[in-house]
C-alpha cells in the first residue's frame, strides 16, 4: 500500500500508543539494558514526559521505539549506524534509523545513503527503503533520540534519550571484539569518545567513522561531507581485516 493511499498519521498502528511499550520482543542482551534505564531517574523522567505528551494528544513516532533491539542481537552487532532522531513525517519512522517500510517513498536522507552505497560498493539502489535485512545481519540502526513528535524534527532531543543510547553503544563496545561505528551528524559524533574508550578498556577493537548527516541540508557540506565519505566500503574492509567474513547484505534491488 502506498504512503499516499493510507492515512498513516491517524492510524493507531503507526504511531506510539502507550508508554512504556512491551519489552518482550527485545533480543538477548538488550532487555536488561532497557529495563535498567527505565528504572533509573533519567528513565523515569523521560517516561513521565512521554506519558504526559501522549495524554495531551501528541502524535509521537515511531510505534516501536525499541524495534532495533528486537532485530539485532547484542552479540551479533558488527556495525552501528547512528543517526539523530526518527523521521517526523506520517508513516515514515519504523523504529530503525533511516529505514522505512516497503511501499513508503524513501526520504531524502535514505536516498543519499543508497547513492553512497552504490558509489562505494557498486550495489544497486534498492526498490524500497526497508533496512530490515541489514538489521538482521548485524547492523544496529540506532538514533540518538528514539522518539519524535509529528512534524517537529529534533523535538525529543532534550527528552533524555541520550542516557539510554549512550549505554547501548557502550554495551556494544563492551561485548563486541570488533565493531565499526558510523556516526552521521553532530548528535551521533558526540558519542565517539565513549565508544572508543569503552572498547579500549575491554581490549576490543573499535573503528569509528564520522561524516555529516545524510540529509540534503548537510550531505555535501564541508569539512566531512556524507556524499563521497566511503563509509560502506571502509567499514567492510576493516571488518574483513579483523578476520570477520562480513559484507553488506544486499537489499531488495531490481533485476539486472
Put a short name on every predicted segment.
Residues 1-16, 20, 253:
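Sequence termini and other peripheral, non-core segments
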Residues 13-34:
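Generic N-terminal amphipathic, Lys/Arg-enriched alpha-helix
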Amino acid at each position: 500500500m502506498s504512503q499516499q493511499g493510507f492515512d498513516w498519521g491517524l492510524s493507531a498502528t503507526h504511531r506510539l500508543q502507550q508508554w512504556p511499550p512491551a519489552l518482550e520482543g527485545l533480543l538477548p542482551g538488550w532487555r536488561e539494558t532497557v529495563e535498567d534505564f527505565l528504572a533509573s531517574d533519567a528513565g523515569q523522567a523521560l517516561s513521565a514526559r512521554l506519558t504526559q505528551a501522549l495524554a495531551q494528544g501528541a502524535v509521537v513516532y515511531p510505534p516501536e521505539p525499541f524495534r532495533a533491539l528486537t532485530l539485532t542481537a547484542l552479540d551479533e552487532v558488527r556495525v552501528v549506524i547512528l543517526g539523530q532522531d526518527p523521521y517526523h513525517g506520517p508513516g515514515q519512522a519504523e523504529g530503525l534509523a533511516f529505514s522505512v517500510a516497503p511501499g513508503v517513498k524513501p526520504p531524502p536522507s535514505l536516498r543519499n545513503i543508497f547513492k553512497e552505497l552504490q558509489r562505494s560498493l557498486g550495489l544497486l539502489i534498492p526498490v524500497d527503503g526497508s533496512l530490515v535485512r541489514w538489521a538482521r545481519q548485524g547492523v544496529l540502526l540506532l538514533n540518538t533520540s528514539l522518539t519524535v513528535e509529528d512534524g517537529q524534527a529534533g523535538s525529543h532531543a532534550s527528552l533524555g534519550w541520550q542516557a539510554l543510547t549512550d549505554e547501548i553503544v557502550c554495551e556494544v563496545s563492551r561485548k563486541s571484539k570488533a565493531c565499526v561505528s558510523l556516526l552521521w551528524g553532530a548528535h551521533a559524533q558526540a558519542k565517539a569518545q565513549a565508544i572508543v574508550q569503552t572498547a579500549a578498556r575491554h581490549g576490543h577493537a573499535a573503528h569509528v567513522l564520522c561524516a555529516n548527516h545524510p540529509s540534503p541540508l548537510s550531505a555535501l557540506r564541508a569539512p566531512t561531507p556524507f556524499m563521497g565519505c566511503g563509509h560502506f566500503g571502509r567499514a567492510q574492509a576493516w571488518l574483513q581485516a579483523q578476520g570477520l567474513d562480513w559484507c553488506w547484505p544486499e537489499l531488495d534491488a531490481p533485476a539486472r
